[in-house]
From Swiss-Prot:
Domain PAS: 15-44
Top-rank taxon: Eukaryota
Gene it is expressed from: KCNH2
InterPro entries: cNMP-bd_dom (IPR000595), cNMP-bd_dom_sf (IPR018490), Ion_trans_dom (IPR005821), K_chnl_volt-dep_EAG/ELK/ERG (IPR003938), K_chnl_volt-dep_ERG (IPR003967), KCNH_animal-type (IPR050818), PAC (IPR001610), PAS (IPR000014)
Tissue-specificity statement: Highly expressed in heart and brain.
Family annotation (NCBIfam families): sensory_box
Domain PAC: residue ranges: 66-118
Record's protein name: Voltage-gated inwardly rectifying potassium channel KCNH2
């Protein structure tokens, strides 16, 4: 479909939308068609029938539907016959609000032999046009209703005309017969065809109001700044919509782009640009509808019963052949990917590969591999790894099962004796598995790997060495076929134990499956599989224990005997019979699962000591597995609901913000709706923060990918270099807008250029829709034509969900300054679909001095050293800001108002030589504080400005600029003005000082050579100072290290600072720095590179109180004390571990001996016979008591560190500190109660007193707290604590 939409309420029924099919049909861009009359007189030519044109105009005037065949001309001059279908769209009250004109090509006319061509069509024929591209346009009915109500509320009441707002001009179409007025306008074309077209004069009224200045319909718009004139023959169009008989009053057409208005200013050759016409007279019948401005009327007009459904679609039904980017343009997106030829199987390999060293895509390389060498990321290796994984899983399941259940079964033995090894299916499968494992070893010897430098190693020798140092031993042990080696020897138990060596391969599999730990579902599945596998192993062990005790047990109390009695299959006296293998395995698996998940149900219970001990171990393992699985499940669920929790938290903040500031309900609803939509679109993630976490080179590639559609399909960006596109992509910002969101308000500064990527927007002036824009449209203002940002002449509102790319004017101009060869192409190709700049709000903007001289040539702006905070001067007519003067070039400082800034002597681009001369001339002139609005006299110098030479266009700061803030007190021999010059460098870490502090007598900008020489001097002074400080510090620290070698710890040579003043060690001052002081030296010491100090030197603290080094006398006094033991000595560490083992022994055997051994008859008889020495535990307890007493003596001579982190070695202070601390606990735990109360007969009292040794566990727990940061150590300590508490409770239970 090819159609246009015109607003019936706007002057001349201007076009507010045209789809891509119409643009392709006529050859004009959307920017050239917007705001033109819907009669399409710009398509008329010599063969256009005047009668057909008059019929279209009559249909528009009469607001009636009509189909007309008419000959139109394309932009290249070719003619075609078209069927135009005029469809008026009415609101619920029957008033026409818009027209839809549909165009269907009937046939093409051959215009080769035609001598006459329309003057409107002078462009050369283009070869990329494809006639008849079918594209549709879809706009929902609520948008049309909203358009109706907005337009209805913008018309003045009454029937008299008047001057309306410039952006909201409406046209009155008289629908009833009336007497012709002398002020009425007639159509020349209709009057010329009176014999053919009959109709009253009131049906031929114009769509414009009288009194408009005479003007001709302009030709096709030219947005290029290099165009110098409009088409002088454009006024000779064959069909004009409205023209007065005196040719003195002709309505103008307001176009989307204002380039024609600007070009009409030049040289006085053309009349002044047209303005909006006055509002025409209102008909009494329509005033009731148009006067509806209240909310109730607007709601009443939103009914849809009387309006037909009209669908408009922005989506193309088939691709544009001329929009397809060439090969050079398509290479901008991910250029590195095209250099590789990976097929689909390799992509699948990267997903399925189990190798831990698979390279990421951007590091893949094509190494030179030897023959029969396999790449570790090849498809074959991926498939082989999965096959080995399946074999390992088979081994983990069937190896314990066969070792426990099958080796000693009578039927299995009889079958093996009859037909040999081949009769066992599992044995054959095991043999195949062993062969596969051996083949895997051979493959691993020829498989590449990635070394520490991320290089693919393919040399066979290096691969073999790497494999020998890694997994070779485990793989070799797991691949030994023990069944064949020991087959027939009769030692089935040995075979079963040796076959379990295959389980070692599970370690390697666990390492490879660790990559899936980031997926919640995968972790849960692996945990459940691990739980089931451990239960299977424990079931095999449980059966092995019962089977081992079954032949030697006469009491028949084992779990197998109980199982046989329960199911009616008891064992006979010879040990035969009993339950089947299936019954045994299922019962064992049931017991292990019930013990792992709970305490069991009692129907299968342990009876023998071996079974009970194993049950204890099962319950201990079960508690750990139960906690780990449910802990991970809780974490997975929490992770799943983390987004919901964040949403509710952020929503609560929004509501608290609304409540605190008492925001009214309409604005509150907008806030909540926007928050909900933004959250659904981004899930609460700051995409910009995520992007900034990557390096700049990767950011550029990502931005290039995000903006690939815009850069490929937008005409101005075609032909740009990759570097230019990367720079532009970094500057673009993506904006998402929901329906009804206002992107730009009327009167806002136009600081950016917008490119629509998806969706549709409407532009309103007041409540009148003046344009509807869609995909690939551009709106904003032509930045190259204006030195200052203008103000918007309307509101920009989203009709659907929209994605827009915007770039700020400063960013765009900065990139174009860096790529001047692309700048000319960009400005000449840029076609802004709708120009939002309001020229009426800026007096004299189109014909002002800002454009008059600057339009004749391309503007050159030097923005490389311009700060983002340096704004342009205020616009004329506004109150000037009485703030700091702007430093740099601006429109207000280039000349007087009324003088073209381009004609200023300093306006043109200057060479580096002229820049230097100019800088030298300015260096002696004073800097003046000039307000923004005050003009500068022509002869007055511009003062201190930022560097704008062509050679200084880099966007980076000077390497020394970061240090200026730290050494500003030292290098004060430069003037303040020079320091401020370098504070003007962009994006420097040092904040720019306020310009109000600049003295009026400050010198201007220094020449560039002088600046560079002073920078070199500053660099030399910094290097000299750093070298001297490093040498002095190294010397001092070497002297101190000679004394610190006597004391092991690093903090032993550090004492607290005294109350005296800081050290004032003399330092040689540097001659060019007269202001070098100790305070400034302390500042310099903050950035001295301590990495250059000698190795082993202690690191001096820079925060907090300064510590002074201990004196040699203190060190000597420290070493003069005899028999001191320091806490960091190796002997002290060994002694502490020995005491720890003794404490653990005490914690285990003291409750056991107190509960089980003291009142046993055999123990009492043995003690009565040979005395105390006959009890082994008693002897060990005596040795433990002696060791604890020795530990008390050692603690009296062990140094400690006080609260000031000083090493205390005085014996008296050590004794006082020990008496206040652990002495009482250590003394009670070291008392030998066995010897003191031996022979008294009070065994219960001895047992209770011996438990006092457990007090040492408190001290041990304090020392073991340092291992709390290691997860495995904490888990091991928790398990040991659990077992120890169970042991104590068992002793108490006894």
């Amino acid at each position: 479909r090819k159609f246009i939409i015109a607003n019936a309420r706007v002057e001349n029924c201007a076009v507010i939308y045209c789809n891509d099919g119409f643009c392709e049909l006529c050859g004009y861009s959307r920017a050239e068609v917007m705001q033109r009359p819907c009669t399409c007189d710009f398509l008329h030519g010599p063969r256009t029938q005047r009668r057909a044109a008059a019929q279209i105009a009559q249909a528009l005037l009469g607001a009636e539907e009509r189909k007309v065949e008419i000959a139109f001309y394309r932009k290249d001059g070719s003619c075609f016959l078209c069927l135009v279908d005029v469809v008026p769209v009415k609101n619920e009250d029957g008033a026409v609000i818009m027209f839809i004109l549909n165009f269907e090509v009937v046939m093409e006319k051959d215009m080769v032999g035609s001598p006459a061509r329309d003057t409107n069509h002078r462009g050369p024929p283009t070869s990329w046009l494809t006639p008849g591209r079918a594209k549709t346009f879809r706009l929902k009915l609520p948008a049309l209703l909203a358009l109706t109500t907005r337009e209805s509320s913008s018309v003045r009441p009454g029937g008299t005309g008047g001057s309306g707002a410039p952006g909201a001009v409406v046209v009155d179409v008289d629908l009833t017969p009336a007497a012709p007025s002398s002020e009425s306008l007639a159509l020349d074309e209709v009057s010329a065809l009176d014999n053919h077209v009959a109709g009253p004069a009131e049906e031929r009224r114009a769509l414009v109001a009288p009194g408009s200045p005479p003007s001709s319909v302009p030709g096709p718009p030219h947005t290029s700044p290099r165009a110098h004139s409009l088409n002088p023959d454009a006024s000779g169009s064959s069909c004009s919509l409205a023209r007065t008989r005196s040719r003195e009053s002709c309505a103008s057409v307001r176009r989307a782009s204002s380039a024609d208005d600007i070009e009409a200013m030049r040289a006085g050759a053309l009349p002044p640009p047209p303005r909006h016409a006055s509002t025409g007279a209102m008909h009494p019948l329509r005033s009731g509808l148009l006067n509806s401005t209240s909310d109730s009327d607007l709601v009443r007009y939103r009914t849809i019963s009387k309006i037909p459904q009209i669908t408009l679609n922005f989506v193309d039904l088939k691709g544009d052949p001329f929009l397809a980017s060439p090969t050079s343009d398509r290479e901008i997106i991910a250029p590195k990917i095209k250099e590789r030829t990976h097929n689909v199987t390799e992509k699948v390999t990267q997903v399925l590969s189990l190798g831990a060293d698979v390279l990421p895509e951007y590091k893949l390389q094509a190494p030179r591999i030897h023959r029969w060498t396999i790449l570790h990321y090849s498809p074959f290796k991926a498939v082989w790894d999965w096959l080995i994984l399946l074999l390992v899983i088979y081994t983990a399941v069937f190896t314990p099962y066969s070792a426990a259940f099958l080796l000693k079964e009578p039927e299995e033995d009889a079958q093996t004796a009859d037909c040999g090894y081949a009769c066992q299916p599992l044995a054959v499968v095991d043999l195949i598995v062993d062969i596969m494992f051996i083949v895997d070893i051979l493959i691993n010897f020829r498989t590449t790997y990635v070394n520490a430098n991320e290089e693919v190693v393919s040399h066979p020798g290096r691969i073999a060495v790497h494999y020998f140092k890694g997994w070779f031993l485990i793989d070799m042990v797991a691949a030994i076929p023990f069944d064949l080696l020991i087959f027939g020897s009769g030692s089935e138990e040995l075979i079963g134990l040796l076959k379990t060596a295959r389980l070692l391969r599970l370690v390697r599999v666990a390492r490879k499956l660790d990559r899936y730990s980031e997926y919640g579902a995968a972790v849960l599945f692996l945990l459940m599989c691990t739980f089931a596998l451990i239960a299977h192993w424990l079931a095999c062990i449980w059966y092995a224990i019962g089977n081992m005790e079954q032949p030697d047990m006469n009491s028949r109390i084992g779990w197998l005997h109980n199982l046989g009695d329960q199911i009616g299959k008891p064992y006979n006296s010879s040990g035969l019979g009993g339950p089947s293998i299936k019954d045994k395995y299922v019962t064992a698996l049931y017991f292990t699962f019930s013990s792992l998940t709970s305490v069991g149900f009692g129907n299968v219970s342990p009876n023998t000591n071996s079974e009970k001990i194993f049950s204890i171990c099962v319950m201990l393992i079960g508690s750990l597995m139960y906690a780990s699985i449910f802990g991970n499940v809780s974490a997975i669920i929490q992770r799943l609901y983390s987004g919901t929790a964040r949403y509710h938290t952020q929503m609560l903040r929004v509501r608290e913000f609304i409540r605190f500031h008492q925001i009214p309900n309409p604005l509150r609803q907008r806030l909540e709706e926007y928050f909900q939509h933004a959250w659904s679109y981004t899930n609460g993630i700051d995409m910009n923060a995520v992007l900034k976490g990557f390096p700049e080179c990767l950011q550029a590639d990502i931005c290039l990918h995000l903006n690939r559609s815009l850069l490929q399909h937008c005409k101005p960006f075609r032909g740009a270099t990759k570097g230019c596109l990367r720079a532009l992509a970094m500057k673009f910002k993506t904006t998402h807008a929901p329906p009804g969101d206002t992107l730009v308000h009327a009167g806002d500064l136009l600081t950016a250029l917008y490119f629509i990527s998806r969706g549709s927007i409407e532009i309103l002036r007041g409540d009148v829709v003046v344009a509807i824009l869609g995909k690939n449209d551009i709106f904003g203002e032509p930045l190259n034509l204006y030195a200052r940002p203008g103000k918007s002449n309307g509101d920009v509102r989203a009709l659907t969900y929209c994605d827009l790319h915007k770039i700020h004017r400063d960013d765009l101009l900065e990139v174009l300054d860096m790529y001047p060869e692309f700048s000319d192409h960009f400005w000449s190709s840029l076609e802004i679909t709708f120009n939002l700049r309001d020229t009426n709000m800026i007096p004299g903007s189109p014909g002002s001095t800002e454009l008059e001289g600057g339009f004749n040539r391309q503007r050159r702006r030097k923005l490389s050293f311009r700060r983002r905070t340096d704004k342009d001067p205020e616009q004329p007519g506004e109150v000037p800001a009485l703030g700091p003067a702007r430093v740099g070039a601006g429109p207000s400082s280039w000349g007087r108002p009324g003088t073209p800034w381009g004609d200023s002597p300093s306006s043109g681009p200057s060479s580096p030589e002229s820049s230097e001369d100019e800088g030298q001339g300015r260096s002696s002139s004073p800097l003046r504080l000039v307000p923004f609005s005050s003009p500068r006299p022509p002869g007055e110098p511009r003062g201190a400005e930022t560097l704008t030479e062509d050679g200084d266009k880099s966007d980076t700061c000077n390497p020394l600029s970061g240090a200026f803030s730290g050494v500003s007190n030292i290098f004060s021999f430069w003037g303040d003005s020079r320091g401020r010059q370098y504070q003007e460098l962009p994006r420097c870490p040092a904040p720019a000082p306020s310009l109000l502090n600049i003295p009026l007598s400050s010198p201007g900008r220094r020449p560039r050579g002088d600046v560079e020489s002073r920078l070199d001097a500053l660099q030399r002074q910094l290097n000299r100072l750093e070298t001297r400080l490093s040498a002095d510090m190294a010397t001092v620290l070497q002297l101190l290290q000679r004394q610190m070698t006597l004391v092991p710890p690093a903090y032993s040579a550090v004492t607290t600072p005294g109350p005296g003043p800081a050290s004032t060690s003399p330092l040689l001052p540097i001659s060019p720095i007269p202001t070098l002081t100790l305070d400034s030296l302390s500042q310099v010491s903050q950035f001295v590179a301590f990495e250059e100090l000698p190795p082993g030197a202690p690191e001096l603290p820079q925060d907090g109180p300064t510590r002074r080094l201990s004196l040699p006398g203190q060190l000597g006094a420290l070493t003069s004390q005899p028999l001191h033991r320091h806490g960091s000595d190796p002997g002290s560490a060994v002694w502490d571990w020995l005491i720890l083992l003794l404490v653990i022994y005490t914690a285990v055997f003291t409750p056991y001996s107190a509960a089980f051994l003291l009142k046993e008859p055999e123990e009492d008889a043995q003690t009565a016979d040979c005395g105390y020495a006959c009890q082994p535990l008693a002897v060990v307890d005596l040795i433990v008591d002696i060791m604890f007493i020795v530990d008390i003596l050692i603690n009296f001579r062990t140094t400690y560190v006080n609260a000031n982190e000083e090493v205390v070695s005085h014996p008296g202070r050590i004794a006082v500190h020990y008496f206040k601390g652990w002495f009482l606990i250590d003394m009670v735990a070291a008392i030998p109660f066995d010897l003191l109360i031996f022979g008294s007969g009070s065994e219960e009292l001895i047992g209770l007193l011996k438990t006092a040794r457990l007090l040492r566990l408190v001290r041990v727990a304090r020392k073991l707290d340092r291992y709390s940061e290691y997860g495995a150590a904490v888990l091991f300590l928790l398990m040991c604590t659990f077992a120890l508490i169970a042991h104590w409770l068992a002793c108490i239970w006894y």
